[in-house]
Amino acid sequence: EDDLEDFNPTIA
């Protein structure tokens, strides 16, 4: 989920 980190700085 690399894209998720782009939209979710919480999971990054």
UniProtKB/Swiss-Prot annotation:
Q: Which GO terms describe its cellular component?
A: extracellular region
Q: What's in the keyword line of the UniProt record?
A: Secreted
Q: In which tissues is it expressed?
A: Expressed by the venom gland.
Localized where? Secreted
User: Which superkingdom?
Assistant: Eukaryota
The record's comment on protein family reads: Belongs to the SA81-like family.
What is the protein name given in its UniProt record? Venom peptide Sa10
The species is: Sphex argentatus argentatus (Black digger wasp)
